[in-house]
Amino acid sequence: MLRTAGRDGLCRLSTYLEELEAVELKKFKLYLGTATELGEGKIPWGSMEKAGPLEMAQLLITHFGPEEAWRLALSTFERINRKDLWERGQREDLVRDTPPGGPSSLGNQSTCLLEVSLVTPRKDPQETYRDYVRRKFRLMEDRNARLGECVNLSHRYTRLLLVKEHSNPMQVQQQLLDTGRGHARTVGHQASPIKIETLFEPDEERPEPPRTVVMQGAAGIGKSMLAHKVMLDWADGKLFQGRFDYLFYINCREMNQSATECSMQDLIFSCWPEPSAPLQELIRVPERLLFIIDGFDELKPSFHDPQGPWCLCWEEKRPTELLLNSLIRKKLLPELSLLITTRPTALEKLHRLLEHPRHVEILGFSEAERKEYFYKYFHNAEQAGQVFNYVRDNEPLFTMCFVPLVCWVVCTCLQQQLEGGGLLRQTSRTTTAVYMLYLLSLMQPKPGAPRLQPPPNQRGLCSLAADGLWNQKILFEEQDLRKHGLDGEDVSAFLNMNIFQKDINCERYYSFIHLSFQEFFAAMYYILDEGEGGAGPDQDVTRLLTEYAFSERSFLALTSRFLFGLLNEETRSHLEKSLCWKVSPHIKMDLLQWIQSKAQSDGSTLQQGSLEFFSCLYEIQEEEFIQQALSHFQVIVVSNIASKMEHMVSSFCLKRCRSAQVLHLYGATYSADGEDRARCSAGAHTLLVQLPERTVLLDAYSEHLAAALCTNPNLIELSLYRNALGSRGVKLLCQGLRHPNCKLQNLRLKRCRISSSACEDLSAALIANKNLTRMDLSGNGVGFPGMMLLCEGLRHPQCRLQMIQLRKCQLESGACQEMASVLGTNPHLVELDLTGNALEDLGLRLLCQGLRHPVCRLRTLWLKICRLTAAACDELASTLSVNQSLRELDLSLNELGDLGVLLLCEGLRHPTCKLQTLRLGICRLGSAACEGLSVVLQANHNLRELDLSFNDLGDWGLWLLAEGLQHPACRLQKLWLDSCGLTAKACENLYFTLGINQTLTDLYLTNNALGDTGVRLLCKRLSHPGCKLRVLWLFGMDLNKMTHSRLAALRVTKPYLDIGC
């Protein structure tokens, strides 16, 4: 009897200790040691330190006996703040005090079963259910777990990054996993973090608690594990206490297979641990129920459009499609709450069923959580640190570990390498290499076996994967397996090796453990020898590529990347030697020929799908192949580069580009600047972290670009728009610019996070590189210190720069003195753009000193938005009378006013003024300014273009201007009068002007109230053979059908005439 009591106590105590997390178990041991340090039965710390739950229970009972061990454990549970275990233990003690005569017919059955039998009749139904949920969700099996192996969910689970989701459905990518792209949004600016604990709490947007929460996330991002953790934490009393009395978990994949009708009662019974559930208690307060519907995207199409009446009460039996729809649509018990998980591909279908749900997106692991995951996966802290540091230093691997599933794959692969005694190698740097390493690790030989053990009929597996991919099918029935030569024995082998998963509760249906693995095997199907792929689709790789067309939205995107990666020589060797698969020898040549034909059809320009194309080339990791593939393109434009990984992929490929003449790399970081609108990526399936603006790119990125400058003698233009190079990146890039082989002529570094200190390296590059003639540094924090450094290079006799753009570079008046000295010493500089800098009148006065210098050869000067006033125009006027080289001057968006323009006209009228283009848009001009400009048009024979847009000139101003336009000496060819307050009366003057002026060819009148009368008058003049006008823009006017007909007729009689309306 004593032995029975001991077994009983050991069973009960070890069960309770098993529920403690690792930290809690350590605290339990410390508190226990404190409580017993004065007693004779004290347990030595050396015995407790490494003891697990079972060993700890044995130590307690050995030293104190069953009763005292149980008492000590309960008091310690209370001290470590696990009151749920203390309260449950107290209740069990009450039941155990049942008087003699209780059930004794169990005989020699397990005392643990006797305990349950004794407790059940008097146990609270909610506690019974909580116990069941704990048992069901406490343990989880890894995908490669052997029989009986499991992991405590609480010990492995790592908190996921959740944000409130407000993105448009068009921004959601249709594919389920694409490790080559990250989440294309700036998390800190476009989404609000949220915790699981507050999912059903009100916030500023909704004062009432939401009844439905949708958690979306790409495949492998951790939706199901999170749903399981919610169930477990509720059962443990850590979550939603006081909010929900019961949580029920519904697996949509299992619901797919239900062929019989069922009711809500039946659904509850299927979740309940006992034959009957307390339905009346549940119905009584439905608002305290939460149903977790896991995997909405996996439901069959019939679930989205069910036929028949809704299920409106608990007892009604309906097909599972109708039952689940009634539950989701809140036709059945609208008071209850729902937590629905889904992939982005099903969001639109789900939206149609719900009313005002809260949307939450699972973004995966942050950097800190990735580290935490590694330390939880590897129990050895030293080993965990070694692996994490390796992965952190390996950019592609570390980026992919943002996705929990991929994080697990990487950990599994690297653990296999460590256990094999090998060093951590660089073979895991691509997506394909990671998946191949995972596959090989699953096929490691058993002890004593001579070689890897591949699955039987592996080619049939690849054929099944490809067939499912083309038909967009992820669940397979028995007949699908038979079609590809796979029988039950094959499936059993795949399950054992964790390549092919058989659903525990859906035995008739099978699936790959993850869509990405199906795509991996589908790619292998295409590299097998012809006829070796089973009953799958056509193995013509060109059909695959044509359908894919390097589109990130294509359902073939990841498969195509895997295809390139599998053709890597080392990977191919693994396939042939380790798995005995024969790879088709002509696939590489087929790929190169297809790329060549695509280049020819696109005019040797790579733009559409360029980033996806680079991702494919990155996977193959073969220098010669990449060089051949890129040799057919002369112009390469890569847009929307949103992550460090994408920058790395791009620079990796461009380093191996030997033929391109023009390279443009556009980053995708959001900007509030209207001029630089964000080019945001539309995909939500993407799974990499977008680069924050405050972060600079890795050195390797700039090193690769510098290498491209050294090795590609054809490269003459490089544009790096919104690439966060930073000072270190610029230094590395300039090493390439200074290389003798560099022939670059045009360098654009607009908004590349360049500080003033980096200008020293740029200055040295200007001196060393005599080919460089154009440079754009706009949108960088150059400032006065940077300008000083930059001008040292610009003043050097060897500098050959002809154009420099310094828009919005935080320059002030002091910078103009430096630039003036450049204008006085550098005869090569002909274009200068200082737009968007607060130069003010003082700065312009200093700049004019350089403009008046005899050495100055400047032809084009942009001074838009420079805080200039009328006072600056006097200085400009005197400069225009002296400078013989200036041809274009832009003063738009400065408050010059009529007085300023009248002063400017004095210089414009001077006989030596050679200005041809003058822009005065949005300069607060009125009709008075037109009088002075009219005189200029008569006196200045060089002026060809005049922009007066967005000034309140009015009809009187145009009348004054027309006097100059009608003068025989006027040579103006283009005139902008957009939004100048003109009416139909102005058209009378224009009518006569166009009849006289023989040089004006372009007239822009957008957003003026000319009306039908005014426009028809213009049409009358335009129809005259003597009218020389070729461009007339009339956008923004409300014209009737008759006027539009007149314009259409005019287009017919004068097809060369560009009429915009």
Swiss-Prot record:
What's the family?
Belongs to the NLRP family.
Give the source lineage, highest ranks first.
Eukaryota, Metazoa, Chordata, Craniata, Vertebrata
Q: Which PANTHER family match?
A: NACHT, LRR AND PYD DOMAINS-CONTAINING PROTEIN 12 (PTHR45690:SF11)
Q: Indicate what this protein is called per its UniProt record.
A: NACHT, LRR and PYD domains-containing protein 12
> What function does this protein fulfil?
Plays an essential role as an potent mitigator of inflammation. Primarily expressed in dendritic cells and macrophages, inhibits both canonical and non-canonical NF-kappa-B and ERK activation pathways. Functions as a negative regulator of NOD2 by targeting it to degradation via the proteasome pathway. In turn, promotes bacterial tolerance. Also inhibits the RIGI-mediated immune signaling against RNA viruses by reducing the E3 ubiquitin ligase TRIM25-mediated 'Lys-63'-linked RIGI activation but enhancing the E3 ubiquitin ligase RNF125-mediated 'Lys-48'-linked RIGI degradation.
Species? Homo sapiens (Human)
What are the residue boundaries of the Pyrin domain, all occurrences included? Answer: 1-95
Q: What are the NACHT domain coordinates in residue numbering? A: 211-528
What gene name does this entry carry?
A: NLRP12
LRR repeat placement: 828-848, 857-878, 885-906, 914-935, 942-962, 971-992, 999-1020, 1028-1049
Q: Which disease is it linked to?
A: Familial cold autoinflammatory syndrome 2: A rare autosomal dominant systemic inflammatory disease characterized by recurrent episodes of maculopapular rash associated with arthralgias, myalgias, fever and chills, swelling of the extremities, and conjunctivitis after generalized exposure to cold.
